[in-house]
Design a protein with these regions (language model features):
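Short acidic, gly/pro-rich beta-turn/loop elements at beta-sheet edges
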Residues: 39, 73, 209
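Claisen-condensing/thiolase-fold acyl-transfer catalytic domains that form or cleave C-C bonds
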Residues: 1-23, 91, 115-215
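Flexible, glycine-rich active-site loops centered on histidine and acidic residues
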Residues: 24-57
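Short, well-ordered alpha-helical segments in soluble proteins
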Residues: 19-22, 31, 67, 105
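Condensing-enzyme catalytic core mediating Claisen C-C bond formation in acyl metabolism
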Residues: 44-117, 123-126, 139-152, 156, ...
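Short alpha-helical "patches" and their helix-cap loops
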Residues: 27-32, 77-78, 195-202
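Small-side-chain structural scaffolding
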Residues: 7, 11, 15, 27, ...
Length: 215
């Protein structure tokens, strides 16, 4: 289907498609953790007198069923897709994954209440020199909203604060890629505190050297 960081969202789409068309009544999306990722950045952490924090195996499971009229639904009519023609520039990828899907449904980027891209815990990635991955993604999404005329440049910090979230997931390979927010999104959707959430899965460019495109 798709690999690496693009795998979780692609798996959820496949599962939701089977449930929606009636091919399967109940579909479980299950993922194990990554042993090679344990203490992957420990050398950099130790150098900076930071405790080696990558000490847990991640896992994920989600049960997808046909629409029962009560549980929040996955919108299969407004899926994002990074096509070959979109190009490999970060702006092009962000547009394909976060601007075009709402547009297909007649919505703006500001109609999405929460965005869930790669949700790596910054307490782990910052000392390792990898930066704050979720924050960087949110700033890029906000900047695209400015370019599309949907928010003002001065509103970027507000957009990031309201529609983003701190990274809270261990660096367990594909596990942090958007899907850990689904449980929280279900609670928020049922409580009525949000109306829409977008789960974003994007693989790294270095994994797609044959096409020079991110997965």
């Amino acid at each position: 289907v798709r690999g690496f960081c693009a795998g979780p969202v692609a798996s959820v789409i496949t599962a939701a498609s089977m449930a929606a068309c009636g091919a399967r009544a109940n579909v479980a999306v299950v993922s194990g953790g990554s042993v090679p990722k344990l203490y992957m950045n420990a050398r950099d952490h130790v150098k900076k007198d930071v405790k080696a924090l990558e000490n847990c195996i991640g896992s994920f499971a989600l049960l997808i069923t046909p629409d029962d009229g009560q549980t929040p639904v996955i919108r299969l009519d407004s899926l994002g897709k990074h096509t070959v023609g979109a190009g490999a520039a970060p702006q092009a990828i962000t547009s394909a994954l976060t601007f075009e899907p709402p547009q297909k449904a007649g919505l703006k980027m500001t109609d999405v209440d929460k965005y869930a891209p790669e949700l790596h815990n910054a307490e782990i990635t910052l000392p390792a020199g990898a930066g704050n991955v979720p924050e960087a993604n949110y700033k890029m999404i906000a900047a695209l909203s400015v370019m599309k005329g949907q928010i003002e440049r001065a509103d970027i910090p507000k957009f990031v604060a309201e529609r983003g979230m701190p990274g809270f997931v261990p660096t367990q390979g594909h596990i942090p890629s958007g899907v850990p927010y689904i449980g929280h999104a279900l609670e928020a959707l049922k409580a009525g505190t949000i109306k829409r959430a977008m789960i974003i899965g994007k693989g790294s460019l270095f994994l797609g050297r044959l096409t020079n495109l991110a997965d």
